[in-house]
Design a protein with these regions (language model features):
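C-terminal motif of bacterial Sec signal peptides marking the signal peptidase cleavage site
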Residues: 14-17
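Signature of long, low-cysteine stretches enriched in small and polar/charged residues
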Residues: 73-80, 87-135, 245-301, 313-316, ...
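Long, folded non-catalytic interaction modules
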Residues: 24-150
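Bacterial signal peptide processing site
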Residues: 19-22
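Short, well-ordered beta-strand elements
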Residues: 130-142, 219-224, 300-310
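Sec-dependent signal peptide recognition
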Residues: 2-10
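Surface-exposed amphipathic alpha-helical segments
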Residues: 144-168, 191, 197, 301-335
Length: 335
């Protein structure tokens, strides 16, 4: 086993550990948790306080999936993208505790039991683009109290890594530059289009472009108007529900789990809506996201809509990928 070279109590310090040049492995939306069977329930309760985002498809689907493995398998799993080890108490007959003590060393381990240093987090500990976390406390109550209101900050570290890795995956190779350049030349806007996406429909008279991808079925459309007042907060929800009937004709958005959020200074969008779409003519549906973005260069309002149909399968990762694609929209001044 590998003894940790650096230690970082998450409050307020985060250590950047230099180790191997090999890339981390595993899905970016999965948390690989090494814990004993008796502590699995506690691990889930703790992690759900941090990773509490859910999309409705319409069934609830957690954005981050929690997977468990035995602590004895650490050597095989140490390059996982998001690796978590949980230990309660100091009984080294417990696999999670034995592993934690080995990695931290006796002195640092005892600090997690007798002091307030219950959470250790490092970057790139055993692989590039890895987040590695050790959670150790004498009991469940102190473990839960150790978060101290820092849940959003902790989650942001995982979100930043997710976005970075997914952008590399989506946009590094085989982008459809010809289509991107054509959109910019014709309409003075474009987005980054990964390999596998095809243009389904383009209507210059209606200011509408529709892209699609199979396996699973995903649809992505962009519509725009020269009507800045469309972003009036009093009418924005109505515009969301009018959009699919106006553009697609055969689908509608449902009120079930509908959410409307206003963007802030850190958001690329002005408004974001999420919820469930359904077909009017056949038993088909799934989650949707819809974004409003104001083009200040040309005084245009853009509506960007992402849909997926993937019955019985996980959809959250695909929805997040389409949001990353949406966020790449850019404009140039119309001559």
């Amino acid at each position: 086993m590998d003894q940790l070279k650096y230690y970082a109590i998450i409050f307020p310090l985060l250590i950047y550990s230099c180790d191997t040049n090999r890339q981390s492995i595993g899905a970016d939306n999965e948390l690989m948790v090494l814990a004993s069977d008796k502590h699995k329930g506690i691990a889930v309760s703790f992690l759900q306080k941090i990773f509490n985002d859910t999309i409705f498809t319409p069934q609830p689907e957690p954005v981050y999936k929690i997977k468990f493995a035995k602590p004895e398998n650490f050597s095989k799993l140490k390059r996982q993208s998001n690796l978590v080890i949980l230990s309660l108490g100091n009984d080294i007959r417990n696999g999670g505790t034995k592993l934690t003590r080995h990695l931290l060393g006796k002195k640092k381990f005892l600090e997690t039991i007798f002091n307030d240093n219950h959470i250790t987090l490092s970057k790139n500990q055993f692989a590039k683009n890895q987040l590695f976390m050790i959670i150790s406390a004498p009991d469940e109550q102190l473990l839960m109290e150790s978060l101290g209101g820092q849940e959003n900050w902790m989650k942001s570290l995982f979100e930043e890594k997710y976005d970075r890795r997914q952008r590399t995956y989506l946009f590094r190779d085989a982008r459809q530059n010809d289509v991107e350049n054509s959109l910019m030349d014709r309409y003075s806007w474009n987005i980054k289009i990964p390999w596998g996406w095809e243009k389904i429909k383009e209507n210059p008279d209606s200011n509408f472009v529709w892209l699609g991808k199979e396996f699973p079925y995903q649809w992505f459309c962009v519509s725009w108007k020269e009507q800045p007042n469309i972003l009036d907060s009093s009418s924005i929800a109505d515009k969301v529900f009018e959009f699919p009937l106006e553009i697609f004709k055969t689908i509608q958005f449902d009120n079930y789990k509908f959410r409307l959020l206003s963007g802030d200074d850190s958001s690329w969008y002005d408004w974001k809506a999420t919820g469930i779409w359904e077909s009017i003519v056949e038993p088909k549906g799934g989650p949707f996201s819809l974004f409003f973005k104001f083009d200040e260069l040309n005084q245009r309002v853009f509506i960007i809509n992402a849909l997926i149909h993937y019955p019985g399968k996980d959809k959250s990762n695909y929805m997040r990928q389409m949001e990353l694609i949406s966020s790449t929209i850019k404009f140039k001044k119309i001559n």
